[in-house]
């Protein structure tokens, strides 16, 4: 295929001098967090007051648009210093103070977003200024501020604005509480070794004990997933799956109902028929009808595959019940899913996950992963010894552009679970890469937070292959944060359309299914030997295992999210149970309330969970069209990717970036093939 046109800004060097300063600090006491929050609010409000009280004839680019952009840079950094510790600090007092700071700052954000005086001056500036006198990104920034003003109802009567402001404040506090409840959940189940039959010794040895010598199984990922995959005692799996999907059931169920009600009310005041339509206006999909069609069509295509996979699982379950002398109930329960999906991998594809993880010690995976990213994107990483961090497990790396030697950013790695810590894997942007007030470029800083299995005195941290995939995915977000070269904080890093934001990192997951990269990030933790060729081939083939059921479950979650945000009366638990039965063919466990544990619903993905599947269309297309054709470790394609897809941040529309990188408009073919589906006139991708 002919390589696409050169990408905008191929020269990755930027004219602006770079300020390689880390403005972040992690040594604040709970009291200081409270004091600095008040100070930050006062400082920032002064800038908005200045802009909002100017005479209209005095409004200019410098004293209005630039003033707002400059304060956004300093405010974003200071805000992250104050509100990020709620997710990672080992000290409960600091986490609590940080959560309180987040609540105050979120209320303040609402106040500032509803400043009609500021909005009027921005509108006035747009009418007054010659559009071609602004740099393209500045013009986009101006247009975006006006669009956001209208989306906050600043063109509506004052009374309506007050209602919207009140709803927005309530929403932000409810979202913080919803996720805080999940993070702070310390539920555990005391179990005996016998009840954990099937789990490996290293897992059992890593568990804390209760006073009566039982083992403590928490509901955090490093306990929950291995147990559901490997424990051959159905009753233990049932108890743990039920407890997991009953976390924070009472409090979060009430919060979720209120979130859904308030979102619908706000969207209606703004003239939208549903909250989903309000949210989607800013995305690639544009309307809830487009999303519904996408999910329905994909579900129809995947259902036959799901049926075949369920039949295989029932066969396996019947054989297992006979072997272990258990009653066979003739159905698949929610607590059976992961166990038998794992058995499919082990029996049909002969992939022994316990053996495999011995080849993925954390240090080797990290070294290989960092090496691949450096080579692919033309970067060099350097570990900063003795850096100031929030916990002794955390590492800080600086990142340079390999060609120019310039520092472009830094990233923190915080990879192991702790009590009170954020419970999933995520990338947090902490310092936006953008221009500062004096015109110099501020480097981007991000943190990757995860919950991989901790090392023990007998063994290093050993990663399951799906954890290696998660590591690659989240680190892809880190690279998006660091490689973007936007001028404005609003467009820095991953500030792209929400149904595109996952595509760059999803694309990079492909590397953990290819032989060459896999060999570079693995070796046996005791012998140092490489993964045997046969095991490697089986692993790569197993990518197609359970693809129907896995993706149908993603559709269930996306449809629950859409249902809650298009039909206000929908009951979350009932809707989830109905869709599980209808689409997945596996009932939800009675009495559970999965949506009350679904952090995405309160974490900025409201009406947007479909984006994971939607953006896979683009990630599959990018990988198969460029990397698979021209070389998966090709530095040339890697640099095209860095300059076309990562470099702009959100300063261009995703559709424009994709067309530049692909040399054409995106297509669904590679996505459908990757799901094990037939596409007319296309060969399945070589595995």
Curated annotation (Swiss-Prot):
Cell compartments where the protein resides: Cytoplasm
E.C. designation(s): 3.4.24.15
Pfam families: Peptidase_M3
Gene Ontology molecular functions: metal ion binding; metalloendopeptidase activity
Keywords of this entry: Acetylation, Cytoplasm, Hydrolase, Metal-binding, Metalloprotease, Phosphoprotein, Protease, Zinc
Reaction(s) this enzyme catalyzes, per UniProt: Preferential cleavage of bonds with hydrophobic residues at P1, P2 and P3' and a small residue at P1' in substrates of 5 to 15 residues
Modified residues (Phosphoserine): 172
Residues with PTM N6-acetyllysine: 538
GO biological process: peptide metabolic process; proteolysis
Expression sites (tissue/organ): Ubiquitous.
UniProt keyword Acetylation present: yes
Manner of cofactor binding, per the entry note: Binds 1 zinc ion per subunit.
InterPro entries on file: MetalloPept_cat_dom_sf, Neurolysin/TOP_dom2, Neurolysin/TOP_N, Pept_M3A_M3B, Pept_M3A_M3B_dom
Enzyme class: hydrolase
Active-site residue numbers: 474
Chain positions with Phosphotyrosine modification: 278
GO CC, one annotated term: mitochondrial intermembrane space
Cofactor: Zn(2+)
Positions annotated to bind Zn(2+): 473, 477, 480
CDD domains hit by this protein: M3A_TOP (cd06455)
PANTHER family (UniProt xref): PROTEASE M3 THIMET OLIGOPEPTIDASE-RELATED, THIMET OLIGOPEPTIDASE
Record's subunit section: Monomer.
Function: Involved in the metabolism of neuropeptides under 20 amino acid residues long. Involved in cytoplasmic peptide degradation. Able to degrade the amyloid-beta precursor protein and generate amyloidogenic fragments. Also acts as a regulator of cannabinoid signaling pathway by mediating degradation of hemopressin, an antagonist peptide of the cannabinoid receptor CNR1.
Protein name: Thimet oligopeptidase
Lineage, opening ranks: Eukaryota, Metazoa, Chordata, Craniata, Vertebrata
Name of the coding gene: THOP1
């Amino acid at each position: 295929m002919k390589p696409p046109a050169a990408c905008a800004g191929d020269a990755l060097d930027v004219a602006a001098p770079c300020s390689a300063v880390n403005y972040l600090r992690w040594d604040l006491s709970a009291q200081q967090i409270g004091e600095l929050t008040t100070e930050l609010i006062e400082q920032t409000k002064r800038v908005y007051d200045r802009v909002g009280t100017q005479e209209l004839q005095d409004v200019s680019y410098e004293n209005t648009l630039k003033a707002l952009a400059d304060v956004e840079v300093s405010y974003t950094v200071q805000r992250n210093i104050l509100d990020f510790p709620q997710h990672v600090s080992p000290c409960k007092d600091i986490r609590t103070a940080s959560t309180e700071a987040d609540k105050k700052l979120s209320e303040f954000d609402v106040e500032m977003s509803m400043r009609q005086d500021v909005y009027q001056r921005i509108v006035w500036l747009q009418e007054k200024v010659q559009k071609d006198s602004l740099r393209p990104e500045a013009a986009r920034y101006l247009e975006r501020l006006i669009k956001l003003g209208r989306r906050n109802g600043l063109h509506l009567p004052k009374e309506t604005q007050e209602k919207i402001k009140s709803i927005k404040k309530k929403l932000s506090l409810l979202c913080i509480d919803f996720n805080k409840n999940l993070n702070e959940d310390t539920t555990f189940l005391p179990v005996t070794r016998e009840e954990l039959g099937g789990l490996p010794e290293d897992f059992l040895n890593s568990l804390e004990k209760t006073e009566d010598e039982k083992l403590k199984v928490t509901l955090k990922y490093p306990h929950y997933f291995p147990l559901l995959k490997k424990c051959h005692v159905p009753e233990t799996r049932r108890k743990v799956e039920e407890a997991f999907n009953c976390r924070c059931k009472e409090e979060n169920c009430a919060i979720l109902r209120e979130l859904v009600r308030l979102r619908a009310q706000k969207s209606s005041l703004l003239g939208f028929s549903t909250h989903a339509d309000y949210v989607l206006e800013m995305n690639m999909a544009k309307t809830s009808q487009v999303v519904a069609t996408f999910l329905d069509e994909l579900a129809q295509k995947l259902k036959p595959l799901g049926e075949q996979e369920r039949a295989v699982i029932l066969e396996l379950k019947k054989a297992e019940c006979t072997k272990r002398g258990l009653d066979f109930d003739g159905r698949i329960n929610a607590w059976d899913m992961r166990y038998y999906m794992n058995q499919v991998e082990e029996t049909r594809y002969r992939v022994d996950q316990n053996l495999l993880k011995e080849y993925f010690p954390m240090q080797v995976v990290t070294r290989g992963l960092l090496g691949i990213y450096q080579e692919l994107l033309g970067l060099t990483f350097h570990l900063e010894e003795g850096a100031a961090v929030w916990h002794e497990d955390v590492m800080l790396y600086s990142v340079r552009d390999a060609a120019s030697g310039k520092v472009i950013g830094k990233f923190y790695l915080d990879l192991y679970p702790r009590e009170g810590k954020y419970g999933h894997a995520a990338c947090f942007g902490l310092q936006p890469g953008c221009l500062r007030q004096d015109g110099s470029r501020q480097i981007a800083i991000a943190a990757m937070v995860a919950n991989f299995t901790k090392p023990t005195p007998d063994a290093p941290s050993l990663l399951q292959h799906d954890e290696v995939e998660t590591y690659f995915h989240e680190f892809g977000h880190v690279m998006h944060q660091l490689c973007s070269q936007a001028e404005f904080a609003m467009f820095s890093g991953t500030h792209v359309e929400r149904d595109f934001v996952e595509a760059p990192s999803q694309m990079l997951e492909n590397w953990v299914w290819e032989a060459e990269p896999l060999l570079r990030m693995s070796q046996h933790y005791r012998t140092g030997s490489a993964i045997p060729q046969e095991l490697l081939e089986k692993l790569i083939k197993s990518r197609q295992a359970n693809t129907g059921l896995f993706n149908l479950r993603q559709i269930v979650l996306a449809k629950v999210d859409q249902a809650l945000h298009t039909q206000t009366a929908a009951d979350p638990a009932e809707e989830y149970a109905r869709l599980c039965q209808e689409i997945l063919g596996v009932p939800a466990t009675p009495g559970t309330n999965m949506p009350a544990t679904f952090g995405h619903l309160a974490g900025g993905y409201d009406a947007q969970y479909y984006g994971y599947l939607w953006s896979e269309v683009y990630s599959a297309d990018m990988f198969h069209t460029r990397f698979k054709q021209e070389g998966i470790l090709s530095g040339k394609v890697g640099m095209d990717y860095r300059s076309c897809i990562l470099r702009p941040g959100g300063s261009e529309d995703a559709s424009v970036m994709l067309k530049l990188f692909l040399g054409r408009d995106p297509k669904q073919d590679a996505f459908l093939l990757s799901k094990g589906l037939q596409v007319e006139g296309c060969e399945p991708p070589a595995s």
